[in-house]
């Protein structure tokens, strides 16, 4: 099994961490969850704009028109899908003030899981594509995706467990959304594994960079603000950028990057 695929599997499996935290009663504070989402957004923004897009444009045979065009396609494609898909978020369950009936919350969990899964599918592709092109950047994306998945698993599993009393059911529904990312990575492995053209890989990477920027701005940062309205998610974003930037410098200085 390839290292990029393993990173994708680990990132998707992070959903189970949130699910287990929910059923074990060790729920992190909203402040921690919001900071982790901002941190993840910072990692994605820095890698996408400072590493992935420039690396794609630097590939021999890649024209600026194609590179920036694919980046814009990634941006617009994400926003288009985001408007078309069921727009359910983890806070839809986290903010419930009344105890719903198990049947009602089960239906809500299904819709929420469907929405999250459809949104998470491109993240699996992004993790695999990035790691295939540059393992160092792929590790950063995998970390950001994993941080994003923990609150999602927590938000889905917690209310389901409270309503049904079944840890297995709660973990099951939370795990489905993580499996969507794993599926995305597997499909990318099967499809892109046979494409050897550097230009094709660079074009895909530019589009993925656009997707990650849109995800950070449209999903992670607003969600962080909703979970913890009293704190500015920009602090998490700046910390994520700083930590990722320093780690890239260290790795490149050591000759790893």
Swiss-Prot record:
- Topology versus the membrane, per the UniProt entry? Multi-pass membrane protein
Q: Which residues cross the membrane?
A: 5-25, 32-52, 61-81, 109-129, 137-157, 182-202, 203-223, 236-256
Q: Could you say which residues form the signal peptide? A: none
Disulfide topology? none
For this protein, what reaction is catalysed?
Zn(2+)(in) = Zn(2+)(out)
Coiled-coil intervals in this record? none
Question: What are the alphabetically sorted keywords of the record?
Answer: Cell inner membrane, Cell membrane, Ion transport, Iron, Membrane, Metal-binding, Transmembrane, Transmembrane helix, Transport, Zinc, Zinc transport
Any one Pfam family match given in the protein's UniProt record, by short name: Zip
Similarity remark: Belongs to the ZIP transporter (TC 2.A.5) family. ZupT subfamily.
Q: Which HAMAP family match?
A: ZupT
The protein, known as: Zinc transporter ZupT
Quick one: which gene encodes this? zupT
């Amino acid at each position: 099994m390839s290292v990029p695929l393993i990173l994708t599997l680990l990132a998707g499996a992070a959903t189970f961490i949130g699910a287990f935290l929910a059923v074990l009663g060790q729920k992190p504070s909203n402040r921690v969850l919001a900071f982790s989402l901002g941190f993840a957004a910072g990692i994605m923004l820095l890698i996408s704009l400072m590493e992935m897009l420039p690396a794609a444009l630097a590939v021999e045979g890649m024209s600026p028109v194609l590179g920036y065009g694919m980046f814009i396609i990634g941006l617009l494609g994400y926003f288009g899908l985001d408007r078309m898909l069921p727009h359910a978020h983890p806070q839809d369950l986290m903010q419930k003030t009344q105890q719903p009936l198990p049947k009602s919350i089960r239906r809500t969990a299904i819709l929420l899981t469907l929405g999250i899964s459809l949104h998470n599918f491109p993240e699996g592709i992004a993790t695999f594509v990035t790691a295939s092109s540059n393992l160092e950047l792929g590790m950063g994306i995998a970390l950001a995706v994993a941080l994003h998945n923990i609150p999602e698993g927590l938000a889905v599993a917690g209310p389901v467990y409270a309503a049904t009393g079944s840890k297995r059911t709660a973990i099951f529904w939370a795990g489905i959304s993580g499996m969507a990312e794993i599926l995305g990575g597997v499909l990318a492995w099967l499809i892109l594994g046979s494409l050897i053209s550097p230009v094709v890989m660079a074009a895909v990477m530019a589009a993925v960079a656009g997707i990650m920027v849109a995800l950070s701005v449209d999903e992670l940062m607003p969600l962080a603000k909703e979970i913890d309205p009293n704190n500015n998610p920009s602090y998490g974003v700046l910390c994520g950028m700083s930590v990722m930037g320093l780690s890239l410098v260290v790795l490149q200085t050591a000759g790893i990057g």
